[in-house]
Structures are given as C-alpha cells and as structure tokens.
C-alpha cells in the first residue's frame, strides 16, 4: 500500500504489518517520527502480512487497501491500529465503522470486504514476505536489509534512519 508517488531514487521502507498486531501499533510512533524527519525523501510502503492467530487481520488488510483506493490509506491504518482491541471484539463491522468515521464510502467498503476485490494484493504481499523471510510483524525492509521488529522495537528507528541517511547522502 502506498499513498504517495515519490520521485525516483527515493529510499523505500517496506513495512510488513498486520492491523490486529499490538506490536505494529507500538511501531506507529517510529513510523510517524520517520515521516516527520524525512517527509517526501522517504517512501513508506505498507506491506500486508496477516497472521493466522489474528482472526480479523486478513479482512483488515483488505480494508486498508480499500481505504487507499478511496484516498485515505495511512489515515485508515493509523485509526485501526490505534484501536486494536475494538477490532478484536467487533471484527468487520468495526472496519466499516472506521471508514465511516474517516468520511470514506462505508457502503463501498462493506462491498469490497464481501466481494474480496483486494484479496490478490494481500496474498501477493504475504507471499513476498514469506519469500524474503518475514515471519512476524512488524518487519522492515530497506535497501535490501531486513530488520525484524516484534516485541523488540528498540533501536529500529535509529537503524532505519542510519540507512536512509546513507542512501540520501549517496544521491547528492
């Protein structure tokens, strides 16, 4: 998932995430800090990696793609991650409610979840993640380097920043 269209040569941080994952919620602060620091000089790209242990994760990934299609991908992701417990309790109706709260077309959202129009995107992300060794979320990939998050987020923001700074310095 990618809301932006960065200039070519912009470093890309792939964020393998799952919207029912408490560790991904914790990682939001790091992602916000990286966006604040780099702005358009870093492309953050959400990659879906729904885990079987979270029963609403696959639907949430599809919902995030529908939100992207309607123009509010990252806003939606942040809203859902900020309320993981509600997703745990309410499931798909919660996903549609968040869309409504953000001013998205909730009816179209519901239809997208029923007809599965975004399943192939989610499946492709998950397959690619498995192929490169992603086993849990969050996992970051930048410049070919995989950085595993999960319960130990400490130091990841700094490590990503080191790599981005190195890549940006190489462009000058």
Model-assigned labels for residue ranges:
Residues 10, 16, 23-36, 97-172:
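C-terminal cap of thioredoxin/glutaredoxin-like
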Residues 12-100, 170:
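Structural alpha/beta surface segment adjacent to cysteine/selenocysteine redox centers
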Residues 2-9:
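Short beta-strand-to-loop junctions in surface cap/lid or active-site-entrance loops
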Residues 8, 50, 63, 82-85, ...:
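A general structural-boundary detector
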Residues 2, 50-52, 148:
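Generic, ordered loop/turn and secondary-structure boundary motif
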Residues 5, 53-55, 138, 151:
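Solvent-exposed, flexible loop/coil residues
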């Amino acid at each position: 998932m990618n809301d932006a269209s960065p200039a070519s040569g912009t470093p890309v941080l792939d964020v393998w995430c799952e919207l029912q994952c408490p560790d991904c919620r914790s990682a939001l602060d790091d992602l916000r800090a990286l966006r604040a620091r780099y702005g358009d000089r870093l492309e953050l790209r959400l990659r879906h990696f729904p885990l079987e242990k979270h029963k609403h994760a696959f639907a949430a990934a599809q919902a995030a793609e529908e939100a992207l299609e309607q123009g509010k991908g990252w806003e939606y992701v942040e809203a859902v991650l900020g309320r993981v417990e509600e997703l745990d309790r309410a499931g798909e109706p919660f996903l549609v409610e968040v869309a409504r709260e953000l001013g998205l077309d909730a009816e179209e959202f519901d239809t997208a979840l029923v007809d599965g129009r975004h399943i192939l995107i989610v499946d492709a992300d998950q397959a690619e993640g498995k192929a490169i060794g992603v086993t849990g979320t969050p996992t970051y990939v930048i410049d070919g380097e995989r950085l595993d998050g999960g319960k130990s987020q400490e130091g990841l923001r700094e490590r990503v920043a080191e790599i981005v700074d190195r890549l940006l310095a190489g462009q000058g």
